[in-house]
Amino acid sequence: MGDWLLRRRGLALLLVLTLLLNLGALGLEYLADMPPCPLCWVQRGVFGLMSLVALVGLVYFPRGWGRWPLAGALGLSALTGVIIALRHLYIQANPDAVSCGMSPEVLAQFLPWWEVLLEILSGTTDCTQVDAVLGVPLPGWTLVGYLALGALGLYAVLARRA
């Protein structure tokens, strides 16, 4: 029973931390005047997805083989976040790699959603602006967050009983 409770607390901690990270992003946006670029919005969405997966894990909390789909969803969402954060860091390090484009709102009016997503993931000139906290660019912090929270989530779901 103690091991089950410990793993459940890990998922609860994952849920709280991902929600706090998104709340912190809103604080940076409105209080520190750091408007998000399209890739920042996608990264917030990935943290939201991790929150949703953690909530499903808390409510359903599968055992045995049932925990593997939950671990897969957590791992896949964390990996997606890592890839997007690395892409964002690449764009910030190489601002010439992106070109000026239309805003996602305008694209959404004319293109199918998957093409809009591909355009967002390719980056815009808005994504080249480097906003840093404690000297580290924000995508660097999100990269650390995805790695740490992905590891926490996988440990909470897959840890073996002692």
Curated annotation (Swiss-Prot):
Family as reported in the entry's similarity comment: Belongs to the DsbB family.
Name the UniProt record assigns to this protein: Disulfide bond formation protein B
Membrane topology value: Multi-pass membrane protein
Gene label: dsbB
Biological role stated in the UniProt entry: Required for disulfide bond formation in some periplasmic proteins. Acts by oxidizing the DsbA protein.
Lineage, opening ranks: Bacteria, Pseudomonadati, Pseudomonadota, Gammaproteobacteria, Chromatiales
Positions on the Cytoplasmic side per record topology: 1-10, 63-68, 160-162
Domain of life from the UniProt record: Bacteria
Periplasmic face residues: 28-45, 87-140
An annotated Gene Ontology molecular function: protein-disulfide reductase activity
Keywords assigned by UniProt, alphabetized: Cell inner membrane, Cell membrane, Chaperone, Disulfide bond, Electron transport, Membrane, Oxidoreductase, Redox-active center, Transmembrane, Transmembrane helix, Transport
PANTHER family membership: DISULFIDE BOND FORMATION PROTEIN B
Disulfide feature: C37-C40, C100-C127
Pfam families named among the record's database cross-references: DsbB
SUPFAM superfamilies linked to this entry: DsbB-like
Keyword Transcription attributed: no
Record field: transmembrane: 11-27, 46-62, 69-86, 141-159
Any one GO cellular component localisation term in the record: plasma membrane
Organism: Alkalilimnicola ehrlichii (strain ATCC BAA-1101 / DSM 17681 / MLHE-1)
Compartmental location: Cell inner membrane
Major localization listed first in the record, in broad terms: membrane
